[in-house]
Amino acid sequence: VHHGNGTQAIFWNDPNTLFVSTHQWPLYPGTGRETETGVANNVLNVPLPPGTDGVAYRAAVEAKVLPRLEAFAPELLLISAGFDAHVRDPLANFALVEEDFAWITARLVAIAERHGRGRIVSVLEGGYDLEGLSKSALAHVRVLAGA
């Protein structure tokens, strides 16, 4: 749920990368407005309001994220896998469940298979409710593993 401000800063000037962030707005660190697009229009920020549930999240991903990723045709996907958007997480106000994380992971795997021979690196970022984190991470890894 937190904007990836550090990652955005790293890739801000790199036209060979596409940085995408879906995050709660407003929320710490206060970055990630839709108008923040990078020097080469290589940044896509999708700020979502508090209370965003799986239906709204999936609609935003379908409308904004997936078409942009398809157009970019990444040779490698790097996933900052944060699970603090889970409904049980105490630090923010999203209402995603583990099935939502499995859903987005499946879409990212499909894009990686079409454009990057399936190459994905996934890094655990956050999640502060241990039950929500463990269930979400398991759902994510199961999809990555093809289970």
What is each residue range found by the language model?
Residues V1-A147:
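A general "terminal functional-core" signal
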